[in-house]
Structure formats: structure tokens, C-alpha cells
Amino acid sequence: MALSWNIRIRRRSWFRFILPIIVLGLLCYGTWAYCHKLCYEQVDKRLRQKSVSVGLICAVCFLDVVVIFIWLQIVILVGPGTQPHVAPFLILPIASEEKTSNTSQNTSVEYDAVVPPKCYQSDPHGYPIWCSECQSLKMERTHHSSELGHCIPRFDHYCMWIGTVIGRDNYRLFVQFAAYFSTLLLIMWVSICVYIRIITQHNHNYSPNLNANIISTLVFAILGWLLTASLLASSIFYMSQNKTSLEAIIDSKRKKFGTRKIFCYYSEANKLRFVVEFDRSEFHSFWDKKSILANIKDFMGSNILMWIIPLGKPYTSRCKSDGKSGSKTTLVEILGPYEETLSDYTIQAIEDKISRGEYLATLRASGDDSDPAY
């Protein structure tokens, strides 16, 4: 059984590259048809517009290289990212004293634990979400990927055309991929449409002599541009609201089927944790910074120049290494750039619910006495 399961996983890992290979093949075919059949044979040789032909060929080939380079980063060099392992929160004491039967000596057993943050997503009892596959806490906006076998921070979606998951690390590259690919296809189909008319007018006394490869490239370019342009537009729209594609889908289902979202919040005034629930009528973008620029920077990085330069991750800081066994660490130290911050509006909404007595439960966490960096 285990062997057959491993074989299926390996087959799926290879299967996810079938569509990207098809896309790459169509890109190579379209580039050849565009550069040779249109630019060289028609624009250069027939219409005697050598400078235009060279310019179009250089632009298309350059964008081809950029698109392929971005794809390599998205899938291989950068990837979607991996959430660091997060030990259970320090809700119960990490040290337990046991008295042996033969002696009166106490023994202390310590466990790795994380000081709980001020607010985290939880179940109705106030306990954080656990990933049984990774044996780690699953933090906000993190989801487990069965394709890659680990938890992805800020999981957006699985893109079958690219062949991998889009997450925190490669989201900016994904947006740049859609932008550069749509620009490439736009140049191709617009210039083909322009020169089809010129070529037919130039050969009005003869047969139009349009190569079938040019027509097929035009069809593929228009269809591909519609796909990539709509993908780019939806990504920009979701970024402006500080939402991922998965969150938008889940939120719509919550509003339709009445599911809920629950947070465990530490009130400094009451020195107590409250479990607060948001039902479908109270749903909003919990991460929205109330500024389109701030929301986009949260996805694309603070350096605006890097928004157009397709290179690397949108941040430079790293996660700190794990502490010693039995030590207590904060979530900020573990997650580093993967830490997600709720909006001020969401925090205020939680505090308002607490003041009105609208909460599911209360609890005291041992880690709240450890002077956490709230």
C-alpha cells in the first residue's frame, strides 16, 4: 500500500509539468512563426521594413527569455515558500513535576513551546490550528499543499499552467509572470492584426499569401492574452483588498453556507484570552490595511522598483533558527517575514465584541505570563 501511494505521488509530481511543457511548446512555436513567417518573410523581405522587423523580433525574444526566467524562479529557484515549524503554543505549563516512587526527588520535563501571540486563528475552544502532516501549528493564511507536501505561507492557489503552488515567496514573481506574458502576447497579436491588413492591401492584385502559421499564432496569442490579462487584473484586485485567491473563494462560500472564522485574542485590560467568532454577516477582509498602496506592498514588497524587476523574493529578512530544546520563543522570532498581521479594523472589531460580551469562551494561557512582545 505504501509503495503504491509513493508511486502515485511521483506520477502526480511529473503530471503537474505536462501543461507547462505544452505552454512552453506553444510559446516556442508562436515565437518561430511570428519571427520567421511574419517579421522576416513578410515585414522584412516583402514590405522592406527591416528596422521594424528587427525591433519586433528583439522585443518578442527578450520577453520570451524574461517569461521563461520568471517561470524557473517561480517553480524551482524560489518556490512558494515553506512555513517554519511552529511548536505548540504555551497554553499549558511546559514543565511538569513528577515525584518518583523510590525517592523524593522531583524531575522536571520540559517541552519546546512558543509564547502565544496576542491574536491567532483558533477553534471554538481557543486552541490554534494544527497540521497533522507537518506536525506543526498552521498559522494565519497558511495551508497545507498535498502537491508539495508541506505548509505554504499565504497560500494563494495552485496554478496548473505554471505547475506549482503560488504562495508568499513567489506571488510577486507570479504577478510579474502574468504581466510580462500578457505584454508579450499583446505585442504579438496586435502587430499581426496590423500587418495582416497591410500585407493583404499590398498584395491586392495577387493572392494574400498569408501563412497558416501566422493565423494559428494569432489565435493562440489572443486566447493566451485574454487568460493572462484577466489573471493579472484579478491578482491586482485581490492585492488591493489584501486577499488571496483562496481567501476570496472561501469567503464567498462562508457567506453562502454560513461558516465562520474564529480568533483567540488576549485582552491586556482583562488579563484574559477571549475566543471571538465572526459569522457570515460580519465577514470582511481581516488583513486589509485600508490603503491600496499598503495592501499591494504587503504582497509585492516595499521596494517599488522591484515590482518591475523579476528577481527573487519580495523581502530580504530571514527566519531565525530554532532555539534550544525546551526553550521558549516568540512567534515573531520563528516566522520572521512570514508573520501575518491583522488589520487595525479587525482588532477593533474583536475588542468591540469582547466589550459587548459576544465571545464563545475565555481561557488563561501560561505563556501570557512570559512577558510576550505584544
From Swiss-Prot:
GO terms classed as biological process: protein palmitoylation; protein targeting to membrane
Primary localization: membrane
Ranges of residues in domain DHHC: 129-179
Gene Ontology annotations for the cellular component aspect, listed alphabetically: cell periphery; endoplasmic reticulum; Golgi apparatus; plasma membrane
Pfam families reported in the protein's UniProt record: DHHC
Membrane topology classification: Multi-pass membrane protein
One function term, GO molecular function aspect: palmitoyltransferase activity
Keyword Lipoprotein in annotation: yes
Superkingdom, natural source: Eukaryota
This protein's UniProt keywords: Acyltransferase, Lipoprotein, Membrane, Palmitate, Transferase, Transmembrane, Transmembrane helix
PANTHER family: PALMITOYLTRANSFERASE ZDHHC6, ZINC FINGER DHHC DOMAIN CONTAINING PROTEIN
Protein name: Palmitoyltransferase PFA5
UniProt organism field: Saccharomyces cerevisiae (strain ATCC 204508 / S288c) (Baker's yeast)
